[in-house]
């Protein structure tokens, strides 16, 4: 289906820079992109290496919360608990003005971006937009929403919500990387929210989100390995060697390790 939309005048596809946004707490501005994780099933465990910045708990705040993680609740059940923030949908705009939270989230599909929504965002710079799309071309809709915000002169940060139903980690990785890659390279991403209804664990989904941001060179969370694929000029077992290197160095966050196997182009 056709996606109505126009490119923002200030956007340059040939040399994109990060979209100018007004920081709301640790989201937007000069901050690194955040990761929002789903825990609507009540589970709270996280991998210390890939701890999300925010956990969306839906309608029920868990009794035991992860230290250092803030929680997002639906606005109609949010009661102002410390370390929690409300999330509105576009039908709840009238309630937003009555809420005193210094950080608010707004779930918004592109086609719901009415004049009323634009007017609301102009008077509520504390709102972080969570862009949603069920369109076959979800990248196109996410882009259209961002370009509309830029055209209107709005500087609200935007987090991209991506919905999947995958049972294999590689399938989730490939699909979510494709969906998010262009948005990151265009400088439009202030955060990522992967929601998976398949059988994958939360730890896998969280690690995928952080991995995408690292691959996009926007946030580092683990050791990075750059290896040649191996060919007839490789005189040793490259895969086993890589596994040994990873086992010894995977805790060295921020380090980039190059692995060469070629007797012609590298020492091996």
Where are these regions (language model features)?
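Glycine-rich phosphate-binding active-site loops on the catalytic face of alpha/beta enzymes
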Residues: 1, 128-129, 187-202
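C-terminal helical cap(s) of enzyme catalytic domains, especially alpha/beta-barrels
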Residues: 1-4, 65-71, 198-218
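Active-site beta->alpha loop and helix N-cap motifs at the rims of alpha/beta catalytic domains
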Residues: 2-140
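Glycine- and Gly-Pro-enriched alpha-helical subdomains that act as flexible
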Residues: 10-32, 45, 202-220, 230-243, ...
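Catalytic cores of alpha/beta
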Residues: 44-46, 116-120, 140-144, 167-184, ...
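Generic structural signal for well-ordered alpha-helices
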Residues: 114-121, 142-147, 180, 206, ...
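Active-site glycine- and acidic-residue-rich loops that bind
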Residues: 133-142, 166-174, 199-204, 236
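Small-residue-enriched alpha-helical segments and adjacent helix-cap loops
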Residues: 141-146, 150-167, 218-266
